[in-house]
Amino acid sequence: GPEGSTVLGKGHRTILTVLAQYPEGVDESQIAILTGYKATTRYQTLKELRARGFAKRDGERWAPTEEGLHELGDYEQLPSGRALLDYWLHRLPRGEKKIFELVVNSYPEAVSKRDLEEQSGYKATTTYQTLKELRARKLVTIDRGQARAAEGLFDA
């Protein structure tokens, strides 16, 4: 129904929502970052979703099935283009937001991790972890130590 089904627990809804928001599929490291769930919880929940026919796995990637989307009902869809950029700028934790803004402001140029460390004042490990989180959200691409804002963020 419109409110989603009672069959789904909170964890199932949360993970299924992430799958629905990224229809091209997400891997387990992305699911970890996007949900904050520990490995055992993720594993168990994905296993149950797949057993019920609500999620499918293709190689490393997980995606919702038609049944899964139907079961989920209404969920918050991610906007696209500039609206997605604004969406995340209002929702990212402070550390991620700071790094994200630096990467966005230098677009279309890429920024080196070293420059991001210097400009943000964060340690290398923090900068690296933050970039991994931004990449999981599909907000940045990372290539040879250079981070670039995702192209789609600048579409009208």
What would you call each of these model-derived segments?
Residues G1-A39, Y43, E48-F54:
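Long, compositionally biased intrinsically disordered regions
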Residues G36-R52, K56-E60, G121-R137, T141-R144:
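Short amphipathic alpha-helical interaction segments
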